[in-house]
Amino acid sequence: MVEIRLSSGKILNKKVHKIGVIALGSFLENHGAVLPIDTDIKIASYIALNASILTGAKFLGVVIPSTEYEYVKHGIHNKVDEILDYLRFMINWGKKIGVEEIIIVNCHGGNVLIEEHLKNLEKELDVSIEMINITFTHASTEEVSVGEVIGISDVKRLEEHTNFEKYPEVGMVGLKEARRNNPIIDQEAKEVETSGVKVDRELGRSILKNAIEKVVKKIEEKIAKK
């Protein structure tokens, strides 16, 4: 058998190869005029991949299905079980290449619905699983600013973006059912109605820097325990 040189390259140390990083977001979700429908998974992938590059942890890829609260209607989503099945597939393959611990970088609020199932998945697959949630008011200033930094925001369409009748999902301002059912969503929508949506590259860079550092720190903590 070929000897794999675990200590090669710019990595924290060879223990980092036992840690796998997965991106979780959504692929089919309206984000107004400025942002694409797969904004969440692109942001999650950017954060997860950069944390992997900085540490040497294995970037295992992206989860394709996503889920959402029933009362939030701004995209096409899947069942919680479908996400868990996809994670089983990814994690089992990760185990075959030496991964023992999983960090999920999630950038879609609806996916927090899977968290209560992760302990059972850990026991079933005999791995450690931890989810880091990095979410924003939907399609609003923070998300648009992050999107501008990573190159996915079409800022020329910002004025159109805040037409809440045409794009009710922006800030969830026009998603009446979601606002009725969730006071946090309603509060965020009120703030967007009042303040609008702005593009702030400095804010976007700061959010990304802090998010990547958060994942890197978690990887470092896991290595320190090994």
Curated annotation (Swiss-Prot):
Assembly with partners or alone: Homodimer.
Biochemical pathway: Cofactor biosynthesis; coenzyme F420 biosynthesis; Cofactor biosynthesis; riboflavin biosynthesis
Cofactor mode of binding and number, as noted: Requires one Fe(2+) ion for activity.
Name of the protein in its database record: 2-amino-5-formylamino-6-ribosylaminopyrimidin-4(3H)-one 5'-monophosphate deformylase
Chain's role: Catalyzes the hydrolysis of the formamide of 2-amino-5-formylamino-6-ribosylamino-4(3H)-pyrimidinone 5'-monophosphate (FAPy) to form 2,5-diamino-6-ribosylamino-4(3H)-pyrimidinone 5'-phosphate (APy).
GO BP annotations listed: F420-0 metabolic process; riboflavin biosynthetic process
Similarity-based family: Belongs to the creatininase superfamily. FAPy deformylase family.
Keywords from the UniProt entry: Hydrolase, Iron, Metal-binding, Zinc
Residues holding Fe cation 2: 31, 40
Coiled coil: none
Pfam families: Creatininase
Enzyme Commission designation: 3.5.1.102
HAMAP family found in the cross-reference section: FAPy_deform
Molecular function via GO: 2-amino-5-formylamino-6-(5-phosphoribosylamino)pyrimidin-4(3H)-one formate-lyase activity; ferrous iron binding
Entry cofactors: Fe(2+); Zn(2+)
Catalytic reaction list: 2-amino-5-formylamino-6-(5-phospho-D-ribosylamino)pyrimidin-4(3H)-one + H2O = 2,5-diamino-6-(1-D-ribosylamino)pyrimidin-4(3H)-one 5'-phosphate + formate + H(+)
Residue ranges crossing the lipid bilayer per the database entry: none
Residues binding Fe cation 1: 29, 40, 108
